[in-house]
Amino acid sequence: MLPKLTVGFFALVLTAGVMACSNLGNTTGVNVGPNFPSKTLYASNSNQNAISIYSNGTKNGGGPAFEIGGSSTTLNGPQYLAFDHRQNLWVTNYNPSTNKALLIEFEALATGNVLPLTTAPLIGRPRGVAITPRQPNPDASSTASPVPNLMVIADNDPTITYPNRVLLYRAGTIEPYQSLAGPRPHLNLPGGVALDASSALYVTNIQGANVESFVLPTPTPTPKPTPTPSSTPSPTPTPSTSPSPTPTPTPTPTPVNIFPRFAITTANGIITPVGISLDTSGNIYIADQGKPNAGCSSPKGPSILVFPAYKKGLQYKKPIRKIHGCNTGLNAPTDVKVDSAGIIYVADETQGGSGIILIFQPGANGNATSTTYKSPGAVTGLGIVP
Protein backbone atom coordinates (compact mmCIF):
# COMPACT_ATOMS: atom_id res chain seq x y z
CA MET A 1 0.00 0.00 0.00
CA LEU A 2 1.44 3.33 -1.01
CA PRO A 3 2.29 6.08 1.46
CA LYS A 4 0.46 9.32 2.00
CA LEU A 5 -1.14 10.64 -1.18
CA THR A 6 0.77 8.61 -3.76
CA VAL A 7 -1.92 6.08 -4.70
CA GLY A 8 -4.40 8.48 -6.20
CA PHE A 9 -2.22 11.53 -6.48
CA PHE A 10 -4.68 13.60 -4.51
CA ALA A 11 -7.65 11.55 -5.74
CA LEU A 12 -9.85 12.37 -2.77
CA VAL A 13 -9.13 16.07 -3.00
CA LEU A 14 -9.46 16.07 -6.76
CA THR A 15 -12.83 14.38 -6.78
CA ALA A 16 -14.28 17.25 -4.80
CA GLY A 17 -12.80 19.92 -7.01
CA VAL A 18 -12.45 18.77 -10.59
CA MET A 19 -16.10 19.18 -11.50
CA ALA A 20 -15.96 22.93 -11.06
CA CYS A 21 -14.12 25.48 -13.14
CA SER A 22 -11.15 27.24 -11.59
CA ASN A 23 -12.12 29.73 -8.91
CA LEU A 24 -8.74 31.44 -8.69
CA GLY A 25 -9.94 34.73 -10.13
CA ASN A 26 -11.74 36.23 -13.07
CA THR A 27 -9.34 35.87 -15.99
CA THR A 28 -11.88 35.19 -18.74
CA GLY A 29 -10.84 36.65 -22.06
CA VAL A 30 -7.20 37.06 -21.15
CA ASN A 31 -5.11 34.85 -23.39
CA VAL A 32 -1.59 36.26 -23.55
CA GLY A 33 0.51 37.15 -20.55
CA PRO A 34 3.68 39.18 -20.39
CA ASN A 35 6.87 37.82 -21.89
CA PHE A 36 7.39 35.08 -19.31
CA PRO A 37 11.19 34.74 -19.35
CA SER A 38 13.33 31.66 -18.95
CA LYS A 39 13.13 30.13 -15.45
CA THR A 40 9.50 31.20 -14.93
CA LEU A 41 7.84 28.55 -12.73
CA TYR A 42 4.50 26.88 -13.55
CA ALA A 43 2.62 24.58 -11.15
CA SER A 44 -0.47 22.42 -11.62
CA ASN A 45 -3.36 22.98 -9.20
CA SER A 46 -4.98 19.60 -9.57
CA ASN A 47 -8.12 20.25 -7.51
CA GLN A 48 -8.58 23.81 -8.84
CA ASN A 49 -8.40 22.86 -12.54
CA ALA A 50 -5.72 25.43 -13.19
CA ILE A 51 -2.03 26.06 -13.84
CA SER A 52 -0.40 28.70 -11.62
CA ILE A 53 2.36 30.95 -13.02
CA TYR A 54 4.88 32.51 -10.63
CA SER A 55 6.77 35.60 -11.78
CA ASN A 56 10.54 35.56 -11.42
CA GLY A 57 11.38 37.31 -8.18
CA THR A 58 8.23 36.23 -6.34
CA LYS A 59 8.92 36.83 -2.65
CA ASN A 60 9.03 34.16 0.04
CA GLY A 61 5.45 33.21 0.88
CA GLY A 62 4.08 34.80 -2.28
CA GLY A 63 1.49 33.37 -4.62
CA PRO A 64 1.05 33.13 -8.40
CA ALA A 65 0.83 36.25 -10.55
CA PHE A 66 -1.08 34.59 -13.41
CA GLU A 67 -2.94 31.39 -14.16
CA ILE A 68 -4.32 29.25 -16.94
CA GLY A 69 -7.81 28.18 -15.91
CA GLY A 70 -11.48 28.17 -16.85
CA SER A 71 -13.94 26.05 -18.78
CA SER A 72 -12.34 26.73 -22.17
CA THR A 73 -9.02 25.25 -21.09
CA THR A 74 -10.48 21.71 -20.65
CA LEU A 75 -8.39 21.38 -17.48
CA ASN A 76 -10.14 19.12 -14.97
CA GLY A 77 -7.37 17.52 -12.97
CA PRO A 78 -4.00 18.75 -14.34
CA GLN A 79 -1.12 16.55 -13.25
CA TYR A 80 2.38 17.02 -14.68
CA LEU A 81 3.91 19.66 -16.97
CA ALA A 82 6.59 19.97 -19.66
CA PHE A 83 7.69 22.69 -22.08
CA ASP A 84 8.69 22.04 -25.69
CA HIS A 85 11.29 23.91 -27.73
CA ARG A 86 8.74 26.59 -28.69
CA GLN A 87 7.93 27.08 -24.99
CA ASN A 88 4.47 25.61 -25.52
CA LEU A 89 3.16 23.92 -22.38
CA TRP A 90 2.12 20.24 -22.35
CA VAL A 91 -0.06 18.91 -19.53
CA THR A 92 -1.16 15.43 -18.51
CA ASN A 93 -4.70 15.68 -17.15
CA TYR A 94 -6.62 13.05 -15.19
CA ASN A 95 -10.10 13.29 -13.68
CA PRO A 96 -10.53 10.66 -10.93
CA SER A 97 -14.32 11.04 -10.86
CA THR A 98 -14.63 9.98 -14.51
CA ASN A 99 -11.33 8.09 -14.96
CA LYS A 100 -10.82 10.11 -18.15
CA ALA A 101 -7.42 11.43 -19.18
CA LEU A 102 -6.19 14.02 -21.67
CA LEU A 103 -2.96 15.33 -23.11
CA ILE A 104 -3.32 19.12 -23.46
CA GLU A 105 -1.07 21.66 -25.22
CA PHE A 106 -1.18 25.41 -24.54
CA GLU A 107 0.49 28.11 -26.59
CA ALA A 108 3.53 29.87 -25.11
CA LEU A 109 2.56 32.87 -22.91
CA ALA A 110 -1.07 31.71 -22.64
CA THR A 111 -2.98 32.84 -19.56
CA GLY A 112 -6.58 32.88 -18.42
CA ASN A 113 -9.53 31.00 -19.85
CA VAL A 114 -7.91 30.06 -23.16
CA LEU A 115 -8.61 27.36 -25.68
CA PRO A 116 -5.76 24.84 -25.86
CA LEU A 117 -3.84 24.33 -29.09
CA THR A 118 -4.32 20.57 -28.83
CA THR A 119 -6.23 18.04 -26.77
CA ALA A 120 -5.94 14.30 -27.20
CA PRO A 121 -7.39 11.44 -25.14
CA LEU A 122 -5.02 9.26 -23.14
CA ILE A 123 -5.78 5.70 -22.10
CA GLY A 124 -5.21 4.76 -18.48
CA ARG A 125 -3.79 6.91 -15.69
CA PRO A 126 -1.05 9.26 -16.93
CA ARG A 127 1.46 10.89 -14.63
CA GLY A 128 4.81 12.42 -15.54
CA VAL A 129 5.61 14.01 -18.91
CA ALA A 130 9.00 15.12 -20.26
CA ILE A 131 10.45 16.49 -23.51
CA THR A 132 14.03 16.33 -24.79
CA PRO A 133 15.81 19.54 -23.75
CA ARG A 134 16.90 21.95 -26.46
CA GLN A 135 20.49 21.44 -27.59
CA PRO A 136 22.98 23.92 -29.11
CA ASN A 137 23.06 23.92 -32.90
CA PRO A 138 25.58 21.29 -34.05
CA ASP A 139 28.82 22.36 -35.67
CA ALA A 140 28.60 22.36 -39.46
CA SER A 141 31.47 19.86 -39.65
CA SER A 142 29.93 17.48 -37.13
CA THR A 143 29.16 13.97 -38.38
CA ALA A 144 27.18 12.94 -35.30
CA SER A 145 23.55 12.01 -35.82
CA PRO A 146 21.12 14.60 -34.44
CA VAL A 147 19.49 13.74 -31.12
CA PRO A 148 15.83 12.75 -31.63
CA ASN A 149 13.39 15.23 -30.12
CA LEU A 150 11.06 13.07 -28.03
CA MET A 151 8.23 13.36 -25.52
CA VAL A 152 7.48 10.65 -22.95
CA ILE A 153 4.51 10.06 -20.65
CA ALA A 154 4.36 7.65 -17.70
CA ASP A 155 1.11 5.69 -17.82
CA ASN A 156 -0.74 2.90 -16.05
CA ASP A 157 -3.53 1.07 -17.88
CA PRO A 158 -4.93 -1.93 -15.96
CA THR A 159 -6.86 -3.16 -19.02
CA ILE A 160 -3.79 -4.27 -21.00
CA THR A 161 -1.32 -7.13 -20.63
CA TYR A 162 1.48 -4.93 -19.33
CA PRO A 163 -0.31 -2.10 -17.54
CA ASN A 164 2.82 -0.21 -16.50
CA ARG A 165 4.33 1.60 -19.47
CA VAL A 166 5.93 4.75 -20.79
CA LEU A 167 4.40 6.18 -23.97
CA LEU A 168 6.91 7.44 -26.55
CA TYR A 169 6.12 10.33 -28.90
CA ARG A 170 7.88 12.46 -31.43
CA ALA A 171 7.81 15.85 -29.70
CA GLY A 172 4.90 17.94 -30.97
CA THR A 173 2.73 14.94 -31.89
CA ILE A 174 -0.22 13.40 -30.07
CA GLU A 175 0.01 9.78 -31.23
CA PRO A 176 2.70 7.61 -29.61
CA TYR A 177 5.00 5.87 -32.07
CA GLN A 178 5.85 3.21 -29.50
CA SER A 179 5.68 2.34 -25.81
CA LEU A 180 8.12 0.94 -23.30
CA ALA A 181 6.58 -2.04 -21.49
CA GLY A 182 6.93 -5.74 -20.81
CA PRO A 183 8.79 -7.97 -18.35
CA ARG A 184 12.29 -6.62 -19.00
CA PRO A 185 11.80 -2.94 -18.04
CA HIS A 186 10.45 -3.94 -14.58
CA LEU A 187 8.17 -0.88 -14.55
CA ASN A 188 6.06 -0.75 -11.39
CA LEU A 189 3.68 2.22 -11.26
CA PRO A 190 5.86 4.65 -13.23
CA GLY A 191 5.50 8.20 -11.92
CA GLY A 192 8.02 10.87 -12.81
CA VAL A 193 9.96 10.93 -16.08
CA ALA A 194 12.89 12.93 -17.43
CA LEU A 195 14.91 12.97 -20.66
CA ASP A 196 18.57 13.93 -20.85
CA ALA A 197 20.43 15.69 -23.66
CA SER A 198 20.70 12.43 -25.62
CA SER A 199 16.99 11.59 -25.13
CA ALA A 200 17.79 8.78 -22.68
CA LEU A 201 14.84 8.14 -20.36
CA TYR A 202 14.81 8.29 -16.55
CA VAL A 203 11.68 7.01 -14.78
CA THR A 204 10.66 6.59 -11.13
CA ASN A 205 8.89 3.38 -10.14
CA ILE A 206 6.69 4.40 -7.22
CA GLN A 207 5.83 0.85 -6.16
CA GLY A 208 9.15 -0.58 -7.34
CA ALA A 209 11.31 1.58 -5.03
CA ASN A 210 13.76 2.39 -7.81
CA VAL A 211 14.68 4.73 -10.63
CA GLU A 212 15.58 3.25 -14.02
CA SER A 213 17.18 4.64 -17.17
CA PHE A 214 16.67 3.42 -20.73
CA VAL A 215 18.14 4.13 -24.14
CA LEU A 216 15.04 4.53 -26.30
CA PRO A 217 14.63 3.44 -29.91
CA THR A 218 14.81 6.26 -32.43
CA PRO A 219 11.47 6.77 -34.18
CA THR A 220 11.48 5.79 -37.83
CA PRO A 221 11.14 8.85 -40.07
CA THR A 222 7.82 9.08 -41.86
CA PRO A 223 8.52 8.42 -45.55
CA LYS A 224 7.61 11.14 -48.00
CA PRO A 225 5.01 10.06 -50.55
CA THR A 226 6.30 9.43 -54.07
CA PRO A 227 4.49 11.58 -56.67
CA THR A 228 2.35 9.51 -59.03
CA PRO A 229 2.54 10.56 -62.70
CA SER A 230 -0.76 11.68 -64.14
CA SER A 231 -2.43 9.49 -66.75
CA THR A 232 -5.46 9.56 -69.01
CA PRO A 233 -8.59 8.98 -66.94
CA SER A 234 -10.26 5.60 -67.43
CA PRO A 235 -14.04 5.16 -67.46
CA THR A 236 -15.44 4.46 -64.00
CA PRO A 237 -16.62 0.83 -63.82
CA THR A 238 -20.13 0.01 -62.67
CA PRO A 239 -20.09 -0.64 -58.91
CA SER A 240 -20.22 -4.27 -57.85
CA THR A 241 -23.02 -5.48 -55.62
CA SER A 242 -20.44 -7.19 -53.40
CA PRO A 243 -20.18 -5.69 -49.91
CA SER A 244 -17.20 -3.46 -49.16
CA PRO A 245 -14.48 -5.14 -47.14
CA THR A 246 -14.33 -4.24 -43.46
CA PRO A 247 -11.41 -1.88 -42.77
CA THR A 248 -8.52 -3.53 -40.96
CA PRO A 249 -7.68 -1.84 -37.65
CA THR A 250 -4.20 -0.34 -37.49
CA PRO A 251 -2.19 -2.59 -35.18
CA THR A 252 -0.63 -1.04 -32.09
CA PRO A 253 3.16 -1.34 -32.25
CA THR A 254 4.59 -4.07 -30.05
CA PRO A 255 6.00 -2.47 -26.88
CA VAL A 256 9.74 -2.02 -26.57
CA ASN A 257 10.74 -4.74 -24.10
CA ILE A 258 14.29 -3.84 -23.04
CA PHE A 259 16.34 -3.93 -19.86
CA PRO A 260 17.36 -0.65 -18.23
CA ARG A 261 20.93 0.56 -18.75
CA PHE A 262 21.10 1.15 -14.98
CA ALA A 263 18.90 1.38 -11.90
CA ILE A 264 19.15 3.30 -8.64
CA THR A 265 17.53 1.14 -5.96
CA THR A 266 16.85 0.69 -2.25
CA ALA A 267 20.54 -0.13 -1.84
CA ASN A 268 21.20 3.49 -2.85
CA GLY A 269 18.64 4.94 -0.44
CA ILE A 270 15.52 4.94 -2.63
CA ILE A 271 12.23 4.34 -0.76
CA THR A 272 9.19 5.82 -2.55
CA PRO A 273 10.39 7.82 -5.56
CA VAL A 274 7.72 9.95 -7.22
CA GLY A 275 9.16 12.95 -9.10
CA ILE A 276 12.44 13.25 -11.00
CA SER A 277 14.45 15.95 -12.76
CA LEU A 278 17.91 16.53 -14.23
CA ASP A 279 19.97 19.69 -13.89
CA THR A 280 22.02 21.18 -16.72
CA SER A 281 24.98 18.96 -15.76
CA GLY A 282 22.85 15.81 -15.86
CA ASN A 283 22.75 15.30 -12.08
CA ILE A 284 19.65 13.34 -11.05
CA TYR A 285 17.19 14.80 -8.52
CA ILE A 286 14.57 12.47 -7.02
CA ALA A 287 11.56 13.51 -4.91
CA ASP A 288 11.15 10.59 -2.50
CA GLN A 289 8.18 10.41 -0.11
CA GLY A 290 9.94 8.00 2.23
CA LYS A 291 8.23 5.40 4.41
CA PRO A 292 4.55 5.80 5.35
CA ASN A 293 4.14 7.88 8.50
CA ALA A 294 7.89 8.46 8.84
CA GLY A 295 8.39 11.87 10.39
CA CYS A 296 10.65 14.62 9.11
CA SER A 297 13.38 13.64 11.58
CA SER A 298 13.35 9.96 10.60
CA PRO A 299 16.19 8.73 8.33
CA LYS A 300 13.41 7.20 6.21
CA GLY A 301 11.36 10.38 6.01
CA PRO A 302 10.68 12.43 2.85
CA SER A 303 13.74 13.72 1.02
CA ILE A 304 15.24 15.03 -2.20
CA LEU A 305 18.03 12.69 -3.28
CA VAL A 306 20.74 13.88 -5.68
CA PHE A 307 22.87 11.44 -7.68
CA PRO A 308 25.69 12.26 -10.11
CA ALA A 309 25.16 12.33 -13.86
CA TYR A 310 25.36 8.94 -15.52
CA LYS A 311 28.51 7.91 -17.31
CA LYS A 312 29.51 4.51 -18.60
CA GLY A 313 31.00 2.34 -15.89
CA LEU A 314 29.67 4.42 -13.01
CA GLN A 315 28.49 2.34 -10.07
CA TYR A 316 25.88 4.27 -8.10
CA LYS A 317 26.26 4.23 -4.32
CA LYS A 318 24.72 6.67 -1.87
CA PRO A 319 23.44 10.06 -3.07
CA ILE A 320 25.98 12.87 -3.30
CA ARG A 321 23.46 15.11 -1.55
CA LYS A 322 20.30 14.48 0.46
CA ILE A 323 17.90 17.29 1.37
CA HIS A 324 16.16 15.94 4.44
CA GLY A 325 15.01 17.07 7.87
CA CYS A 326 12.39 19.14 9.64
CA ASN A 327 13.76 22.51 8.46
CA THR A 328 13.18 21.52 4.83
CA GLY A 329 9.39 21.46 5.07
CA LEU A 330 9.30 18.22 3.06
CA ASN A 331 6.17 16.19 3.71
CA ALA A 332 4.83 14.31 0.66
CA PRO A 333 6.74 15.61 -2.40
CA THR A 334 5.32 14.72 -5.80
CA ASP A 335 7.66 16.57 -8.18
CA VAL A 336 11.02 18.32 -8.34
CA LYS A 337 12.47 20.69 -10.94
CA VAL A 338 15.85 22.44 -11.17
CA ASP A 339 16.32 25.65 -13.16
CA SER A 340 19.41 26.65 -15.14
CA ALA A 341 20.79 28.51 -12.11
CA GLY A 342 20.54 25.37 -9.96
CA ILE A 343 17.58 26.51 -7.84
CA ILE A 344 15.50 23.51 -6.72
CA TYR A 345 11.68 23.63 -6.68
CA VAL A 346 9.60 20.92 -5.01
CA ALA A 347 5.82 20.32 -5.28
CA ASP A 348 4.53 19.32 -1.86
CA GLU A 349 1.80 19.85 0.72
CA THR A 350 1.80 21.08 4.30
CA GLN A 351 0.91 18.91 7.28
CA GLY A 352 -2.52 20.55 7.10
CA GLY A 353 -3.00 19.44 3.49
CA SER A 354 -2.46 22.78 1.70
CA GLY A 355 -0.47 22.82 -1.52
CA ILE A 356 2.95 24.44 -1.29
CA ILE A 357 6.11 24.85 -3.37
CA LEU A 358 9.40 24.49 -1.49
CA ILE A 359 12.46 26.29 -2.83
CA PHE A 360 16.09 25.38 -2.10
CA GLN A 361 19.24 27.20 -3.11
CA PRO A 362 21.79 25.59 -5.47
CA GLY A 363 23.83 22.92 -3.73
CA ALA A 364 21.35 22.58 -0.86
CA ASN A 365 22.08 19.59 1.34
CA GLY A 366 21.01 18.11 4.65
CA ASN A 367 18.50 19.89 6.85
CA ALA A 368 18.39 22.99 4.63
CA THR A 369 15.75 25.63 5.33
CA SER A 370 13.42 26.20 2.39
CA THR A 371 11.62 29.29 1.23
CA THR A 372 8.11 28.81 -0.12
CA TYR A 373 5.51 29.83 -2.67
CA LYS A 374 1.86 29.55 -1.76
CA SER A 375 -0.48 27.59 -3.98
CA PRO A 376 -4.25 28.11 -4.36
CA GLY A 377 -4.76 24.34 -4.56
CA ALA A 378 -3.12 20.93 -4.40
CA VAL A 379 0.18 21.00 -6.30
CA THR A 380 1.13 17.89 -8.28
CA GLY A 381 3.56 18.85 -11.05
CA LEU A 382 5.97 21.67 -11.87
CA GLY A 383 7.39 23.11 -15.08
CA ILE A 384 10.10 25.69 -15.75
CA VAL A 385 10.21 27.78 -18.93
CA PRO A 386 13.42 26.78 -20.75
Range-by-range predicted roles:
Residues G353-P386:
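Blade-level signature of beta-propeller repeat domains, shared across WD40, Kelch, NHL, RCC1
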Residues T28-G70, Y80-L81, L89, I104:
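An edge-strand/N-cap motif at the start of beta-rich repeat modules
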Residues S141-S145, T218-V256:
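Ser/Thr-rich, Proline-interspersed low-complexity disordered segments
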Residues S55-N60, E107-G112, R170-E175, V215-P219, ...:
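Short loop/turn segments that connect beta-strands within beta-propeller blades
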